[in-house]
A protein has these predicted regions:
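GIY-YIG nuclease catalytic motif and its immediate N-terminal context
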Residues: 1-54, 77-91, 95, 103, ...
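Carbohydrate-associated surface elements
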Residues: 98
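A broadly used, surface-exposed interaction patch
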Residues: 50-74
């Protein structure tokens, strides 16, 4: 399944971190509530799989009503370009008043 965020086609939603590829890209954690997607967090990582393996997604799910989705956009763009994509998506959601909490996921110890 694909989810379009801005001009980018994100893959997902993913339930388990081992479903992700060990590649660089942009991630978005979405909260589906009241029949719309709200953005919880958007960012970039050199290894989406490694990052996702450390995020305590279950902890977030228990704190929020509705459904939480992890989506990714794989790209080998340089880090600064990936940051720009994440920033643009965050701003788009803010302008549409569709930002939900903008939380920072808790990471497990490496």
């Amino acid at each position: 399944m694909s989810i379009y965020l801005g001009l980018f086609e994100f893959e997902g939603p993913f339930v388990e971190h081992d479903e992700l590829k060990d590649e660089s890209g942009v991630y978005a954690i979405l909260h589906f509530v009241d029949n719309e997607y709200k953005l919880l967090r958007c960012g970039e990582r050199d290894s989406l799989q490694k990052w996702a393996s450390r995020v305590k997604l279950d902890e977030i799910k228990h704190r929020l009503p509705g459904k939480m989705l992890l989506t990714v956009y794989y790209t080998n763009f340089p880090k600064e370009a990936r940051k720009s994509i994440a920033k643009a998506i965050t701003e788009e959601f803010r302008q549409q008043a569709r930002v939900s909490y903008l939380i920072k996921p808790t990471l497990q110890a490496a």
